[in-house]
Amino acid sequence: MNNQVQLYSLVKKLYQANFWEDYWDNDIIGIQLPDHKDPVFISILGKAEQNFGFLIYRNLEELSYYFEMRKQAEFSEFNSAIEMLQTHKCISLNFEDRKEIPKEEYEKIKASGVTFRGKKAWPVFTDYKPGYYPFAINEKDVSFLIAVFEKLIETATDFRASLQFYEKEQETYEILMRTYKRDGSYEDGFYVVPEAILEGVLDNEVEYASIKLTDFEMKRVNNQKMKHTIWELDIDFIGVPVVPPNGGRPIFPSLLIVADTKNSEVICSEFVNPIEAEKIQRIIIQLILAQNGKPPKIVVNANRYVKIASCLENLLTTLDIELVPVQKLPLLSVVKEDMLEYFKD
């Protein structure tokens, strides 16, 4: 039996098991595979919204994105689909109508010889990674998923009798866990999710970039006077995927955009890599010099505050500029909507 046949045969068994009749999406299951460093974590979808499927988090780092997604959904609405995508880092298996699945997926299913029929019954795999366009799984993923699904079918079946565990109030966040040994035997227990993972992605310990500029550059910009204005600043993904020059998986480029609220003018719009702190710092001081003055305050979207602060906090503190998180950037929100419409056209 080749990998595709084995994969879709297991997928059909998962579909027929109807786990979403009993599991809520926050009833996370943990499975420790013998040759896997971290446990694999699975969320079962469908009981609440009738969108049937599974989210497979390959390790603890990916699980932190699950909690980040929950946190952001609870405390603020996602402004766009691209913003929501940045909280996804996992493999999803969703069951869709036949007419809604991509042609490539249909060809794989057809070639496997495994039959699927009915509404919301056709499997679609998607690999999610922040900054990248949702993509098809690769052959390495197929082998991994076969190993997971073989264990998930029996584990989720057995744990059905223990789901009342998730209804109890817990001092720590625990999930049902099955640990497999190389000989196929297993032990059932509970897994305490580390506090750092529960905090999500953005609240994990952040390394603030040092000032990457020369003393001459800093002296020059420090001599600028404070202006009576506030800047809005954002570094966010643009929802139009771009294929890298060397090919491969399409990416969502990041755009640094700055607006001066005093005259309602966009003063910077430049594509950047969020990890290139030196480039971002240099753009800011060039803006200050071009505007002949420093803003006493720069406001940023609260959801991206940590990411932006990691690049700019030390620089702005030295320049006596306050970096302030806010729930919404009034001027840039409108500007970004107009830009998205432009890209769509």
Predicted regions and their residues:
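Secondary-structure boundary/capping micro-motif
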Residues: 1-256, 261-345
